[in-house]
Structure formats: C-alpha cells, structure tokens
Amino acid sequence: MGFLSPMHPCRPPTQRRMAAGNHSTVTEFILKGLTKRADLQLPLFLLFLGIYLVTIVGNLGMITLICLNSQLHTPMYYFLSNLSLMDLCYSSVITPKMLVNFVSEKNIISYAGCMSQLYFFLVFVIAECYMLTVMAYDRYVAICHPLLYNIIMSHHTCLLLVAVVYAIGLIGSTIETGLMLKLPYCEHLISHYFCDILPLMKLSCSSTYDVEMTVFFSAGFNIIVTSLTVLVSYTFILSSILGISTTEGRSKAFSTCSSHLAAVGMFYGSTAFMYLKPSTISSLTQENVASVFYTTVIPMLNPLIYSLRNKEVKAAVQKTLRGKLF
C-alpha cells in the first residue's frame, strides 16, 4: 500500500552509486516466500488454498446476493459490494502466485510480472482504504441525518463516490509504481512472498531517498485523510447513538456500525503495523504475519463480518435459498 517510513534502512548512497555503475539489468526476481522449510510447503499450500477458496466464495456470494435481492439495493450495500470486489481483486493479485510458489522449486517472477503485481495490488488496497472511509460517511449520514439520507446519498452521489475511490487508487498506484520503475535493481532475491514496495526498494542499487520521501508523504496523506474521516464520522455516530432514548434503538443503530468498525480496525491495524514503523522494530517473521493477515485473511473475513450480524443479509440469504429450492 505504500505506507513507507522514511526511517527504512538502506545502503549508503556511495555504495549504491558504485553498485549502479556495474549492475546488469534485472529481468526477473526470485520470491523468498514465507518459509524455506520443505515439510511446510504442502500444509501451507493447502491452508492458503482453503483461505482463497473461502475468499472467492464469500466475496462473489456477497456481490451476487446484493445484485439479486432488491431490498439490498441501498447505498450501504452498493458500497459493500464494491468492497467485496476490491477484496476479491487484491487477494487474487497475490494468492494464486503464492500458491504456485509453494509447489515450485524456484519462485521466479518476471520483472514485468512483478511490477504488474505491485501496480494492481496498490490500486485495490488504496481504493479499499478510501472505500472504508466512504462507508463510514454513509453510516454517519444514515444515523445522524436519517431524514435527509435519501437526498444526500442519492444514486448519482453513490456512483460519484465509488468512481472517485477507484480513481484515487489508480492515481496513487500509478505514482508509486512509476517511482519503483525508475529505480535500477542489481539484486534479484525479494525477501517476501510478493512484490511489495518495501522489499523491492531494498534491491535497488541507487539511492532511494527521494522515492522513500515521495511515497511516504503520498501514503501519509492517504492514511491521515481516511483515518480522520472515519474518526470524525464515528465520533458523531456515537454521540447520536447515545442520544437515542430506547435500548432497542441504540442496539439497532450500533449493530449497523459494529461490522464496519471491525473491518476498519483489522485493515488499518495490520497495514499500520506493516508500513508506519521503522523496519528495525519487527522481525521478518512478524512482518510476514502482518502482511499475510491483510492480503489474504482480511479479504476472507470481511464477507463473514458483514453477514453474521446483519439481519438484512441473513434474510436475503434465506430468501435466495428458498427461491432456488422451491
């Protein structure tokens, strides 16, 4: 996602310039993967294959369910269907290649393939960051301004918000991937299981300071804008919920937001651990665990989180199943 700390260690510029003068063009990279232990390759393959299958079924199921049931044709579920699409897409950018690597002797990825993986991963992760923010704003309008909800969150507004979210993802990814394309690489072993910015930057044989600072401020803008919007939205939401006189009303209002809060907490928590810290604080194993969590586990969990406590989704599932069975 590009939340890169400027404290990230790199080789001195003099050493990098010396290397840059002698390096040959890298045409492919080798992904180190999650582990070198041969006895763990098959169990990990089966584990992540299961996670990926659940991710596909869950997110495609959520999108299909929302499309087939007219009672779910509301702004909240329109945004949720796009969130499911993003989860499905960025998981599909990472997981299939990771599964192949578990059963391959050499985890090779071409230069073009690596940069393409980075580009599309960033598109959907940055877009998801802003989509969660849009969903927080939607809940704010629904709870704090219920009488104006249909006017504020009109069909045109929803389409515009989603278009802006994808545009931000495309622009952010283009900038960050473009910076990575300009770097010369003289090493080919990526200490990670996919092509991410931090591991790739370590392979450059020129100074990465300008790239680091550009990516850091770009990512800083993204995370500050989105996190502040979510924080402000839920501050007003909590204030409105506490002002509801009936216990039933408070419970219903809070239940509509609890799922989103859980998704926001998991996503921002894991990405912040990965990118908003000096790399010396955590080990490679800890970074891999955090990275696996937000690239593979969160896309699997989001459909479950939004459906388990949602009466409308449960009712839509029952209606769809009855329609198929009878």
UniProtKB/Swiss-Prot annotation:
Glycosylation sites: N22
Gene3D superfamilies in alphabetical order: Rhodopsin 7-helix transmembrane proteins
Membrane-traversing stretches: 46-66, 78-100, 117-137, 151-171, 223-243, 261-281, 288-308
One term under GO cellular component: plasma membrane
Side of membrane Extracellular, spans: 1-45, 101-116, 172-222, 282-287
Disulphide linkage map: C114-C195
Pfam family, one: 7tm_4
GO biological process, one term: G protein-coupled receptor signaling pathway
This protein's name: Olfactory receptor 8A1
